[in-house]
Structures are given as C-alpha cells and as structure tokens.
C-alpha cells in the first residue's frame, strides 16, 4: 500500500465536489447526506454539526492542504498543484459564508452556503496553518489576497481576546487562549501572534510575541516557552486521553515556529522530540484494530429526534451535541469507535512521529505503520482517515 493507494481513496470517496472540502465520513461509494438550509438555520440536529459528514471540514481540509504542500515541495507535480487549488478554494468558502469576522465554518449544507453557528479552535487553527503554509509556497499567486484573509481572522481573534467566535454576534466558543496554561492553548496563542508579525513586519508585534513567550499565563506555573517545550502529553492526561488527533495541528505549528523563530530552537526541538516519544507509544494502538465489530449508518437524520433549541447558549449547544453523539455512537455508528479511537489515534500519532525531527522515532514509527496498515480494510472504512495515512507517507519520504 503506497501513497497513491491512499490518495485514490481520498479523492474518489472523501473530497466533496464542487466545494473542495474533505469530509469526516462517507459511504463506501463516497455517498453522504448533507443538511438542508432549514436544518442549518435551526441548528438541527445540533449547533456544532457533530455527527454529520461536514463536522470537520476546516480541520481536515486544512491538515490535508498542509500535507499536500509538502508533497508539492518535494515533487512539483502539476496534479498536486491543481488539487491544492481545489482545497484552498474550499477553505476560502468556509470564511466567505461567515457573518461574523473571524468565524470559520465547519462545512456547508446542501446549498453550498448554509452552515452551523458554532465553530471551534480545531477548525480555525488548521485553517490558519494551511493558509499560511500556502501563502509561503510558490503556488500562491495572490499574496495580498491571502495575507488579507489571514489578517482578517487573526486580528479578529485578537480583538476578541483570543476567543473563537460563533457565527452569532457576541457568542464565543470556550475560553481565551490568552488565559490558557495548557499546551495547545499556549501554542495557538504564540503561533498566531507570531504570524501577525510575519504578515505585518511590525516590530511591536514581534515584541508582543517575545513578551508572551517569556511570561507566565494566568493561574500558570511555567513560562509559555517552557510549556511549549513540555509537549502535548500533559494535555492528554488532563483533557483528551490518548487522542493524538486533537493535538496534531498544534504539533505541526511548533514545527513551523522552529523555522520562524530560531531564538527558541531548543524549546521547539524538545517539544517535537517529546511529542514523538509520546506518539511512538500511541502508534501501537493500531494493533488492536478490528475490521469487523459493528456497523456505520451514514444516515444521521434520526439525531433530529433529539434536537432542542440551543437558544444561542454555547454550553447548552454542546450539551445537546454530546447527548446526540452518545446516541449516534451506540445506535448508528458503533464501528466508529474502532475507526477513530483505535485506528485514527494510531495514524495521527504516526504523523506526529515522522515530524518529530528524530530519526530513531520516525524509523520505528514507520516500521509499525507499514506492518499494520496492510491488514486494514481501507475500502470499507467510513472515516476519511486515508488522508492521514497518505500524509504520514508524504512526510516520511
């Protein structure tokens, strides 16, 4: 199973045309059920679009763009350039449909514009990472336009004190990165602050970045640069279990900070190494994967029976989504736990390992990866994680 094998699966089943978004899941022939305009406007089944194929449009498309840009850098294929263009336009759309500046939609409904009101940092941040990586590449022919898009989002987030806006004026998702003392929150604050400097070349922005690096966040113990160096294992213990997928985009941001900020090379390299060590432990979960063990019904509409009006309250909206998510897993997609928590966790861990800047970690990770992927029935897999497997092979090359 080489890179082209996974690439074909991704583009034949999981890229949504004409919008250029990578789906969360699809049927074996690429079929998916999209919400209507009415369902989006009523936030049915929930305002976070959990359980829908468009749930992670900005997240997964952003990560995939990042990987394909690496593929293009290595091989300069016109086909890869065309694919990146399709996905970049998809990311543009997720910004263009917003009413509130700084909001990035998760995906769009069947009309190509309707969307759910609650975003998340796991959508905004991969979007930012992808667009900045594209901006730096020689594929970008509209630097002024891409810079303007990035700064619109970055400056809006700073205006909101680094909180993620919903597409409802005055409504925000979770707390501020400015107050965060967790690894992910700190990395996101530092990366975005540094990007504002890189895009504006305003020395005051660089001074602010240095100030953030050297200061202790509210209720924290360590300076932010120390928190960065500690890696994501602490976040896993306190918040996410062993799930690497939610930490991968911030890990990649540290890889970018290593290029942008040589003054803190030691902290960034220690972070990447530490993450690689943690990832190496998590890759072994792939050995527990079972191709059988439950179905995956792509028709999510029965979740609408559990719908309630979230009344523009993000806590209520999340509670509704969580209740539906449990029902979805138990009754509609029992195999998703195996696909996501077992296989997905291992694949994202492999991606972290091959970008750890440590040859020993990368080599061992790929030994496990290449040995185990051949027994996975990829054609019956409903989650779009073939894109992660492809990305691992791109960065290992």
Which sequence ranges carry the predicted segments?
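Terminal, non-catalytic domain-edge segments
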Residues: 1-17, 137-141, 148, 244-397
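Low-complexity, Ser/Thr/Pro/Gly-enriched N-terminal "stalk/linker" regions
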Residues: 1-59, 85-86, 90-107, 141-168, ...
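Carbohydrate-binding/catalytic loop surfaces
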Residues: 19-53, 100-120, 166-188, 226-259, ...
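Non-membrane alpha-helical segments in proteins
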Residues: 53-73, 86, 109, 113, ...
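TPR repeat positional signature
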Residues: 60-61, 68, 131, 186-189, ...
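Short glycine/serine- and small hydrophobic-enriched flexible loop segments
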Residues: 65-74, 129-136, 194-198, 252-259
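Aromatic-rich surface patch/π-platform used for binding flat ligands and interfaces
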Residues: 95-103, 121-126, 130
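Elongated scaffolding segments in large macromolecular assemblies
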Residues: 142-291
């Amino acid at each position: 199973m080489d890179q082209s094998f996974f690439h074909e699966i991704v583009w034949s089943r999981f890229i949504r045309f004409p919008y250029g978004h990578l789906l969360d899941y699809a049927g074996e022939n690429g079929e998916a059920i999209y919400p209507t305009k009415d369902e989006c406007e009523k936030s049915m089944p929930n305002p976070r679009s959990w359980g829908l194929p468009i749930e992670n449009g900005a997240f997964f498309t952003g990560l995939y763009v990042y990987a394909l840009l690496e593929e293009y850098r290595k091989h300069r294929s016109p086909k890869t350039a065309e694919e990146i263009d399709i996905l970049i336009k998809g990311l543009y759309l997720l910004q263009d449909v917003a009413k509130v500046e700084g909001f990035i939609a998760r995906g769009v409904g069947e009309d190509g514009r309707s969307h759910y009101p609650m975003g998340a940092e796991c959508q905004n941040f991969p979007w930012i990472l992808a667009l900045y990586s594209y901006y730096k590449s020689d594929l970008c022919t509209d630097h002024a336009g891409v810079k303007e898009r990035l700064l619109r989002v970055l400056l809006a987030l700073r205006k909101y004190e680094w909180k993620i806006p919903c597409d409802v004026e005055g409504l925000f998702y979770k707390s501020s990165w400015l107050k965060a003392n967790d690894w992910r929150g700190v990395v996101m604050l530092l990366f975005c602050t540094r990007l504002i400097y890189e895009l504006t070349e305003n020395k005051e922005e660089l001074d602010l970045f240095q100030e953030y690096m050297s200061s202790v966040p509210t209720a924290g113990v360590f300076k932010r640069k120390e928190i960065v160096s500690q890696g994501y294992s602490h976040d896993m213990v306190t918040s996410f279990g062993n799930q690497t997928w939610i930490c991968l985009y911030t890990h990649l941001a540290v890889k970018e900070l290593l290029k942008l900020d040589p003054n803190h090379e030691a902290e960034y390299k220690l972070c990447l190494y530490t993450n690689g060590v943690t990832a190496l432990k998590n890759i072994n979960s792939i050995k527990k994967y079972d191709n059988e063990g439950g179905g995956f019904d792509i028709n999510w509409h029965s979740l609408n029976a559990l719908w309630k009006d979230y009344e523009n309250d993000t806590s209520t909206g999340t509670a509704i989504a969580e209740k539906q998510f449990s029902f979805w897993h138990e009754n509609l997609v029992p195999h998703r736990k195996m696909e996501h928590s077992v296989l997905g966790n291992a694949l994202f861990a492999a991606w972290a390992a091959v970008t750890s800047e440590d040859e020993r970690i990368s080599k061992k990770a790929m030994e496990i990866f290449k040995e185990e992927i051949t027994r996975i029935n990829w054609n019956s897999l409903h989650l779009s994680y073939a894109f992660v497997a492809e990305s691992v092979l791109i960065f290992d090359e």
